[in-house]
Amino acid sequence: MNNWSQGSTPQGSDPSPYAPELGSLPDGSQSDDHGDTVNKTGTTTIGITTDEGVVIATDMRASLGGRFVSNKNVQKVEQIHPTGALTLVGSVGGAQSFIRTLRAEVNLYESRRGEPMPIEALATLAGNFARGGPFRAINPILGGVDEEGSHVYSIDPAGGVMADDYTVTGSGMQLAYGLLEQEYEEGLSLEEAQSVAARAIESAVERDTGSGNGVFLAAVTGEGVDIQGHNDFDAVI
């Protein structure tokens, strides 16, 4: 079980908002001289709700400029709430800063009110920060469990927050969505959802150069968040 208040994040520097491998379409007018030197997660990240909890899956690759693999073991999902986790999509530095900020707000809320922040409120807060903060082009997935049930939200760089039964962000999203549309069905168990999510990540890494090297799976329940990394897809499919 991960310690949500002290989770580690991969190292990176301040991002460029222009990056072809981001989970959103880039605007060429925003490019600068750092596009090939800033670590970006490229990425395929997936969130699936079940009656038992939430499954979040990500690949493991970080790249420079979308052309050079700078890290093969990046943990792109982090615990930010006692029963909630967030993915890293976009520039590593911006995603790290976003996670640190949300963790601080979750801690502050709990210390003031004596109870965990509701996941819907956390999603709204994350959207506000994405729109108004200095985090630049990020497109994470938030998954969590509270008294209202299981929740998955995608958060776009403009601050839009969308709830769904399952969602995908990142450069491999079209490939992963193709498999999820076929495999997802209501009533999946947590274990079945993990297998579906892992297969969708595997489908994306076959063709998307920004995704690869394995899968991290996070199981989010009312008991907490458990994150495990797997270099071999066969171990979890």
Curated annotation (Swiss-Prot):
SUPFAM superfamilies: N-terminal nucleophile aminohydrolases (Ntn hydrolases). One of its GO terms (cellular component) is proteasome core complex, beta-subunit complex. The keyword Lipid biosynthesis does not apply. Its EC number is 3.4.25.1. InterPro entries: Ntn_hydrolases_N (IPR029055), Pept_T1A_Psome_bsu_arc (IPR019983), Pept_T1A_subB (IPR000243), Proteasome_sua/b (IPR001353), Proteasome_suB-type (IPR023333). Residues 1-45 are annotated as: Disordered. It is found in: Cytoplasm. Disulfide bonds: none annotated. The active site is at 43 (nucleophile). It catalyses: Cleavage of peptide bonds with very broad specificity. Residues 1-14 have a biased composition (Polar residues). Keywords: Autocatalytic cleavage, Cytoplasm, Hydrolase, Protease, Proteasome, Threonine protease, Zymogen. Component of the proteasome core, a large protease complex with broad specificity involved in protein degradation. The 20S proteasome core is composed of 14 alpha and 14 beta subunits that assemble into four stacked heptameric rings, resulting in a barrel-shaped structure. The two inner rings, each composed of seven catalytic beta subunits, are sandwiched by two outer rings, each composed of seven alpha subunits. The catalytic chamber with the active sites is on the inside of the barrel. Has a gated structure, the ends of the cylinder being occluded by the N-termini of the alpha-subunits. Is capped at one or both ends by the proteasome regulatory ATPase, PAN. This is Proteasome subunit beta 2. It comes from Haloterrigena turkmenica (strain ATCC 51198 / DSM 5511 / JCM 9101 / NCIMB 13204 / VKM B-1734 / 4k).
